[in-house]
Amino acid sequence: MAPLRLFWIWLLVVGTRGVKDGDMRLADGGSANQGRVEIYYNGQWGTVCENMWDLTDASVVCRALGFQNATEALGGAAFGPGYGPIMLDEVRCTGTEPSLANCSSLGWMRSNCRHDKDASVICTNETRGVYTLDLSGELPAALEQIFESQKGCDLFITVKVREEDEIAMCAHKLILSTNPEAHGLWKEPGSRVTMEVDAECVPVVKDFIRYLYSRRIDVSLSSVKCLHKLASAYQAKQLQSYCGHLFAILIPQDPSFWTPLELYAYALATRDPVLEEICVQFLAWNFGALTQAEAWPSVPPALLQGLLSRTELVVPSELVLLLAVDKWSQERRTSHKEVEALVGQVRFPMMPPQDLFSLQFNLSLYWSHEALFQKKILQALEFHTVPFELLAQYWGLNLTEGTYQPRLYTSPTWSQSVMSSSYNPSRSFQTPQHPSFLFHDSSVSWSFVYLPTLQSCWNYGFSCSSDDPPLLALSKSSYSKSNPTIGYENRALLHCEGSFVVDVIDFKGWKALVPSALATNSSRSTSLFPCPSGVFSRFQVVIRPFYLTNSTDMD
């Protein structure tokens, strides 16, 4: 009967309910049913902007505070301006939400309002007649205490580690039986369970069992892989899904690149294509930084082969890429066949003639693979000196192949950046018209600007809709000489603090809409790898010219 007695003790545990994200209050109204709307988020209170504020939104606030409805939705800081951040802007509720945090909006702290536009409400004096005392917030801690006590158990767990001592702990069947997440651990009738665990995951086993009691767990960069592995092994589907979601959030937190490489190996071992693609995408977008990291020589040949096959590979230049492959092969002592496969993925036509000439002096691989390099250099020099119409006509070259397409080159030749916090987030710059040496005397002038608000669109002379900002604008100077055989597929790189690239976006015409840096209730998409700060630190445009092979000039 001891487990049953402990279970009833757990049900009787009480405590105080703390403030949590999304909680609301009314301030400076003089009475309980009116005031300036304030909402809690990330450890502080803030206000709500009046943009799109209406009676439906106000009623969500009133009902959450125990009143029947709202009678007025006020703007213009009707009860005085507030303090702190403007938490929400352009709130759009359906009326059934428990908090403004659950309504559509621009997202947390993504507003350009001032406090003279703080939203307020007046609620009906009548309350709903129902009052709730909610002490359930203390239940997880109470359940954890029962597990930590290791008393009154009726389920005995043995944790087996390969060729090492076993670890013993115990649990309570009654509590575990209430949680579907625990059913995979305790499948068969009986009082004993054996868990087989890798040595690296032993430190989180106790956390995993504790989670089956409390249904809450802290997941970090160091624990996410093992918790995902345990959740997968014991069918804790919700924890497994949660850890899978966290991979993209946690990977950018490791500047050493060991974590994405480790998770890539784990994805292959568990045949998880989603995790595999997340790791490969992060490494591709941060390839230049990867080549400078201590982990660079540890990149597996198959992974490097896959990375080099990608056009959306972020690197200063193709020469930098080839030199990095050269260094990688020296440190790994790669086989002749593996080197040739990797060199075959290098886009020699994207290197200018002077770089091609320097390879014989700066590349250790050159003389051990001389025939291959001479073939590739000749192919590149033909690209640089022969009009593409003749290449297509006489050699049958397909100039849409990856070999003839630029990657995401971040050197000043093809790229320019603006800081999101800059007072004047705009740049004017020039690039070559095309990578081919045939165009070395022709340049194109560009203007690149970050437009965080509708007002900034108007200030820079752009026509934006209200749904566009924040966005990036890229325009080509009308004075730049046009060539009907050349097109552009330009991209914008979104950098998080620490300069990791967390997303790459396309330009549709002159504009590229900037996604949210963090997941919000906004209808706007979120960057693939979120920024913990909630803002992108830098935007970098990359110019990518290519031949229009179906141009009428070919006829």
UniProtKB/Swiss-Prot annotation:
Entry's Gene Ontology BP terms: cell adhesion
All residue ranges annotated as the SRCR domain in the record: 24-124
SUPFAM superfamilies xref list: POZ domain, SRCR-like
GO cellular component: extracellular space; membrane
Glycan-carrying positions: N69, N125, N362, N398, N550
The keyword Protein transport is assigned to this record: no
Summary of the function given for this chain in its UniProt record: Promotes integrin-mediated cell adhesion. May stimulate host defense against viruses and tumor cells.
Organism annotation: Bos taurus
Protein name as annotated: Galectin-3-binding protein
Localization annotation: Secreted; Secreted, Extracellular space, Extracellular matrix
This protein's record includes keyword Transmembrane helix: no
Keywords recorded for this protein, A-Z: Cell adhesion, Disulfide bond, Extracellular matrix, Glycoprotein, Secreted, Signal
Disulfide bonds, paired cysteine numbers: C49-C113, C62-C123, C93-C103
Pfam families (UniProt xref): BACK, SRCR
Superkingdom: Eukaryota
InterPro entries, sorted: BACK, BTB-POZ/Galectin-3-binding, BTB/POZ_dom, SKP1/BTB/POZ_sf, SRCR, SRCR-like_dom_sf
Subunit structure: Homodimers and homomultimers. The multimers form ring-like structures with a diameter of 30-40 nm. Binds LGALS1 and LGALS3. Binds ITGB1, COL4A1, COL5A1, COL6A1, FN1 and NID. Interacts with the gamma-tubulin ring complex (gamma-TuRC), composed of gamma-tubulin, TUBGCP2, TUBGCP3, TUBGCP4, TUBGCP5 and TUBGCP6. The unglycosylated form interacts with PDE4DIP; this interaction, which is PDE4DIP isoform-specific, may connect a pericentrosomal complex, made of AKAP9, CDK5RAP2, EB1/MAPRE1 and PDE4DIP, to the gamma-tubulin ring complex (gamma-TuRC) to promote microtubule assembly and acetylation.
Signal peptide: 1-18
Gene3D superfamilies: 1.25.40.420, Potassium Channel Kv1.1, Chain A, SRCR-like domain
BTB domain span: 153-221
